[in-house]
């Protein structure tokens, strides 16, 4: 179907339909890992079913959050969408849904697994029939000393929702944001090494490294 951006009520219903169908797809894939390996012999013995990560970009990030414990709420009628999926061990997001009205006021509260989020100062969400600047709102309060699980936040100066057209869409204004994408990619790999591979060097890098110094002020990293 085509998203109806001229009717907020219908658009929210469509978005929840998308996330609901996608979360079911994710659970179905987990249920089918053995069959998938049988269909694709090259994957045999390469899938670690004990280390599973939910990952996504934009609305895909909303779906990843949904299967990691967060609740989406339709602001028009209060309908709540949740998931009883418990098999994901970590959550990785590039450009979360920011201040989308479906997001709860404090979305970090529902997620109980190690979380990584990368966004940029020029990130935005498409709302209604036009574009609306969307500040980074997934970030937990500064006065919160520690959350229920480690939440890593990377903010990249100048990065937009599509990295200048390098990811997701190619029909957006450039220029390509190679440096911004490289920062997000490198930090994502470090996060996965730390929490999926239990690599102590990667964990030390996340906890004690200084991304701002390393990138000459281009990006910052915080942990709660």
Describe each model-derived feature in a short phrase.
Residues 2-49:
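Alpha/beta-hydrolase active-site loop
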Residues 1-9, 150-153, 157:
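Active-site machinery of serine-nucleophile hydrolases
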Residues 156-162, 166-224:
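Alpha/beta-hydrolase-fold serine-hydrolase catalytic core, especially in secreted/extracellular enzymes
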Residues 29-110:
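Primarily recognizes the serine-hydrolase "nucleophile elbow" in alpha/beta-hydrolase
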Residues 51-55, 90-94, 115-119, 152-155, ...:
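Structural recognition of the beta-strand scaffold that forms the well-ordered cores
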């Amino acid at each position: 179907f085509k998203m109806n951006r001229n009717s907020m009520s219908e658009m929210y219903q469509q978005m929840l339909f998308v996330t609901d169908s996608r979360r079911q797809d994710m659970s179905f894939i987990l249920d089918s890992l053995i069959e998938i390996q049988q269909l694709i012999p090259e994957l045999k013995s390469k899938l670690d079913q004990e280390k599973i990560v939910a990952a996504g970009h934009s609305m895909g990030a909303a779906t990843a959050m949904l299967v990691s414990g967060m609740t989406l709420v339709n602001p028009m009628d209060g309908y709540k969408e949740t998931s009883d999926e418990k098999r994901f061990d970590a959550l990785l997001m590039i450009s979360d849904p920011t201040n989308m009205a479906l997001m709860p006021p404090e979305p970090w509260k529902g997620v109980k697994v190690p979380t990584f989020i990368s966004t940029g100062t020029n990130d935005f969400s498409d709302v209604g029939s036009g574009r609306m600047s969307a500040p980074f709102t997934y970030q937990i309060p500064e006065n919160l000393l520690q959350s229920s699980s480690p939440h890593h936040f990377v903010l990249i100066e100048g990065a937009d929702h599509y990295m200048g057209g390098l990811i997701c869409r190619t029909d957006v204004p450039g220029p390509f944001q190679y440096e911004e994408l490289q920062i997000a990619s490198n930090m994502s790999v470090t996060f996965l090494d730390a929490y999926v591979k239990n690599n102590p060097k990667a964990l030390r890098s996340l906890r004690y490294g200084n991304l701002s110094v390393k990138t000459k002020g281009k990006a910052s990293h915080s942990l709660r």
